[in-house]
Amino acid sequence: MEYNKKTGKWESPYWHPALTTDAVVFGFDKEDGSLQVLLIKRGKAKPGETPAFEGYWALPGGFIQKDEPTDECVHRELFEESSMRLFNNDKGIQPEFIEQLKTYSARGRDPREFVVTVAYYALVKKDKYIIKGGDDAAEARWIPVDRVGELAFDHSEMLKKALTIINQAIK
């Protein structure tokens, strides 16, 4: 840390990228047996924000808050954007499977700025949840993985990686 005499504050000499989390959430449809993924439709940017993939389907996720661990951020974003609550902080239990998938940091993966994301994947009993879009998600919906089209950002890559891991685990 270095002291900045102009601002009167201690500052890091290192540049810091924006940090986000994204979640690839899978569930089986009991009626047709298909593997489905939870997607959100990105809403319009708020006034003053740079638009990024408005109207595109994406994985639920978003920016980390100050002093927030990534494990908490992914749960908060899932709840804010889809109403899915996988973790109950009051009881300290985690009833569903969720695990880190990979960290993504390619230049240009987000048109707004340099963003590093910690991606997670989860397996849930989807009938336990009533899904609805919230926060900056215009809509939330379960979509069969074989019907997913182009996704925002590099979310198609994340979905593909999570599917590969699941396929390897069940073979």
Residues covered by each model-derived region:
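N-terminal strand-loop-strand
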Residues: 2-59, 71
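Unchanged
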Residues: 63-170
